[in-house]
């Protein structure tokens, strides 16, 4: 029998038919919806006189446009000041009500970012195909699922048929062996991977993360690395199923129960790549070589270790790369050879679908405890990824740690990850952000984004500039997974 990768197995489990043009029709187990990419899809159903093929395969929640201050949230839909944002959230409510789709509405205790809500509800399960009109759907691959983003027209197709036409990708394995040093996290792993292979390195591939350092990560840590697979060019990111996967899923609202649970676990336990499976490309990193990472430019691949210096375009022989460095330096307001630790900051954002889970908040709080946000920092935001994460953090007293340190404690949502809600950067402002993209204008017109782990973001907040979180000593305990 031919050895198979995890991706091969998941593909074969869901392939309905192969078409003459080489594409396949695959079955979709779970469809997650939010307010931005679903309105046109629902309208398409109405115009065609169709209903969703499997209503219970869909769940929805608003996240991109929702305000995150308590006052605005208490005001309901009318508190959303931007007319387009308000209309999108309202339209999602109406569409889900009309078609009978389960939605965690803006002020539901279970509301949150789609890629946080799906896993914590158990709506994401091992072996599933999971799609959403959002590129960071790769997050769900942490559960041994085949998960990726889709476009608005495809959202309509999945609603109508529960299937999708797509082509099989190649297999890419990223192996990270060894033990992560103190203060180095899952976010640092994935930033280091992107720095190594570039933002096009995974193009056309399904990316499986493997190795002892990956197996040592918590499920939250695995979600972080799978989340940013798309920044490495891979539409799909995944980690094989193990006992941590199964333990995380057990008992969650959507998880199987009783005999169904036993049968599911038996199947899930097979969702690993066979020892002799062929990968088209293999990339290897040693965990011990990875240091806390900071992005300096306008692409996630423009990333360096905390003890390094911004590149000098004069030393770059390739004219295209040299021009790219020059443009990034100009936009970011940095100088060639500037030390990363000399980059001063205006704002700090801890949140997003990459790093807003309970372990992320614990890691940031461990650094913030007993310290104060630097006087030069205009704003330091902590935005939980869901209402359930927020409630757990408050039960653990993390909100008090952040508030005492001078951070703002917010309601769940995408927040400052992207400029689609009131949380934005001003032009020229530098932000230490735990999000996933640092493109020009991503967090606001003219805003300058630096991607870091939650611990590094908290360390920057209390210092006013980037510092090596490892130099803060024992306060960084427990920061390895985030």
Swiss-Prot record:
<dbReference type="GO" id="GO:0009098">
    <property type="term" value="P:L-leucine biosynthetic process"/>
</dbReference>
<comment type="similarity">
    <text>Belongs to the aconitase/IPM isomerase family. LeuC type 1 subfamily.</text>
</comment>
<feature type="binding site">
    <location>
        <position position="414"/>
    </location>
    <ligand>
        <name>[4Fe-4S] cluster</name>
    </ligand>
</feature>
<dbReference type="InterPro" id="IPR018136">
    <property type="entry name" value="Aconitase_4Fe-4S_BS"/>
</dbReference>
<dbReference type="Pfam" id="PF00330">
    <property type="entry name" value="Aconitase"/>
</dbReference>
<comment type="pathway">
    <text>Amino-acid biosynthesis; L-leucine biosynthesis; L-leucine from 3-methyl-2-oxobutanoate: step 2/4.</text>
</comment>
<dbReference type="InterPro" id="IPR004430">
    <property type="entry name" value="3-IsopropMal_deHydase_lsu"/>
</dbReference>
<keyword id="KW-0408">Iron</keyword>
<keyword id="KW-0004">4Fe-4S</keyword>
<keyword id="KW-0100">Branched-chain amino acid biosynthesis</keyword>
<dbReference type="InterPro" id="IPR033941">
    <property type="entry name" value="IPMI_cat"/>
</dbReference>
<dbReference type="GO" id="GO:0046872">
    <property type="term" value="F:metal ion binding"/>
</dbReference>
<dbReference type="InterPro" id="IPR001030">
    <property type="entry name" value="Acoase/IPM_deHydtase_lsu_aba"/>
</dbReference>
<feature type="binding site">
    <location>
        <position position="417"/>
    </location>
    <ligand>
        <name>[4Fe-4S] cluster</name>
    </ligand>
</feature>
<feature type="binding site">
    <location>
        <position position="353"/>
    </location>
    <ligand>
        <name>[4Fe-4S] cluster</name>
    </ligand>
</feature>
<dbReference type="InterPro" id="IPR050067">
    <property type="entry name" value="IPM_dehydratase_rel_enz"/>
</dbReference>
<protein>
    <recommendedName>
        <fullName>3-isopropylmalate dehydratase large subunit</fullName>
        <ecNumber>4.2.1.33</ecNumber>
    </recommendedName>
</protein>
<keyword id="KW-0411">Iron-sulfur</keyword>
<keyword id="KW-0028">Amino-acid biosynthesis</keyword>
<dbReference type="InterPro" id="IPR015931">
    <property type="entry name" value="Acnase/IPM_dHydase_lsu_aba_1/3"/>
</dbReference>
<keyword id="KW-0456">Lyase</keyword>
<keyword id="KW-0432">Leucine biosynthesis</keyword>
<comment type="subunit">
    <text>Heterodimer of LeuC and LeuD.</text>
</comment>
<dbReference type="GO" id="GO:0003861">
    <property type="term" value="F:3-isopropylmalate dehydratase activity"/>
</dbReference>
<comment type="function">
    <text>Catalyzes the isomerization between 2-isopropylmalate and 3-isopropylmalate, via the formation of 2-isopropylmaleate.</text>
</comment>
<dbReference type="GO" id="GO:0051539">
    <property type="term" value="F:4 iron, 4 sulfur cluster binding"/>
</dbReference>
<dbReference type="InterPro" id="IPR036008">
    <property type="entry name" value="Aconitase_4Fe-4S_dom"/>
</dbReference>
<keyword id="KW-0479">Metal-binding</keyword>
